[in-house]
Amino acid sequence: MQITLPGVVLTNSPAEKQYVIVKIFSPAGLLSAFAKNGASLSCDFRESLFPISFSLFTIQQSPPKMRKVIQGELQNPFTTIKSSYPLLQSAGKMIQAILKTQWHEKPSPHLFSLFLNFLQRIPETQYPNFFSSMFLLKLLQHEGSLDLSRSCTLCKTPLESSTIYRYEGALFCEKHAHEETISFSQEEDHILRVIVQAKKFQELVCLAEFPIDIDTKIDALFSSFLSETSEPSSLYYKGKTLL
């Protein structure tokens, strides 16, 4: 059976006989597939297999064999991102976030659309690292792992102090905060909520034009969420054959 779907290549790994194995993020979720002669210069869709490339893929499915990429029509090579180290680093941060949170073959059309929009807009931003941190917040929201209430997750006490404590997406009062919690000022927490609750993408682009020093805390918050989860994308290859 053949399917055609849009997708962004997240990783590209060489295999035997000039084959390559790619991880593609699509509306159908994370997919792994191999491309015969994908590493060869003679492959007419070779560029569509490069990481951070958006393409329309034709894929052959023959379980239990691994999917095979039959064709790839390059839609956007994201050349600007690949020619700038700060942009490449920020895009890489988003890619790693997807690889560490998304299960293979779990449909995620909304998250895919969000990720593609972030990739398309990140070259426009003055502070790409902050912009990619916004994506991490949106991803936490997508996973249902970000408490946006105004009270402590444990005791339900209203949070009225000047400092807000967060860990793994949960909120804590000063009494229940521990050494690993990440502290946010009221202003920083307000910015966090504005990012999460933004309904239009242009709002995020405009916000990313300001030198707001909160990306390190957002990244730490996301890392605290990962500390309690496994890495889904590493659990897939067992039992798969290329041919």
Swiss-Prot record:
Q: Which domain of life is it from?
A: Bacteria
Entry-linked InterPro entries: ARFGAP/RecO, NA-bd_OB-fold, RecO, RecO_C
Record keywords: DNA damage, DNA recombination, DNA repair
Give the source species.
Chlamydia trachomatis serovar D (strain ATCC VR-885 / DSM 19411 / UW-3/Cx)
Please give the biological process terms from Gene Ontology that the record holds: DNA recombination; double-strand break repair
User: What's the family?
Assistant: Belongs to the RecO family.
Q: What does this protein do?
A: Involved in DNA repair and RecF pathway recombination.
Descriptive protein name: DNA repair protein RecO
* GO CC term, one of those recorded: bacterial nucleoid
User: Gene encoding it?
Assistant: recO
